[in-house]
Amino acid sequence: MPTDHMDLLARLRSLSAREREVLEMASRGMTNTQVAGELHVSVHAVKFHLAGVYRKLSVANRTQATMLLYSFGAGQGAGLWPSEVRD
């Protein structure tokens, strides 16, 4: 998992809007099926987007991805991505 703040910022910025959306939902504890239903896409599409998240963030699973998201001040309760990521 990346530890340098600037490296993490670059990795978070590399996520597509859909990858960010899927990661936010997954970090709130939603299952792939629930995310798919909410976004009106297939479960396969959700898995595809999560695989992209894992690759871009250099993590192995949704728990590690969520930990990175929370460590940067985003995630459950925040509702928004940090401005450094959204820009």
Regions found by a protein language model. Give the residues of each.
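Regulatory hinge/linker segments at domain boundaries
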Residues: 1-18, 24, 78-87
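Basic, Lys/Arg-enriched C-terminal extension of HTH/homeodomain DNA-binding domains
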Residues: 9, 55-87
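The N-cap/first-turn positions of alpha helices
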Residues: 18-19, 47
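Pre-recognition alpha-helix immediately N-terminal to the DNA-recognition helix
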Residues: 20-21, 64
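A cross-family signal for key residues in well-ordered alpha-helices
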Residues: 24, 37, 67
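Short helix-to-turn junction characteristic of helix-turn-helix DNA-binding domains
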Residues: 26-30, 69
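Recognition helix of helix-turn-helix DNA-binding domains
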Residues: 31-64
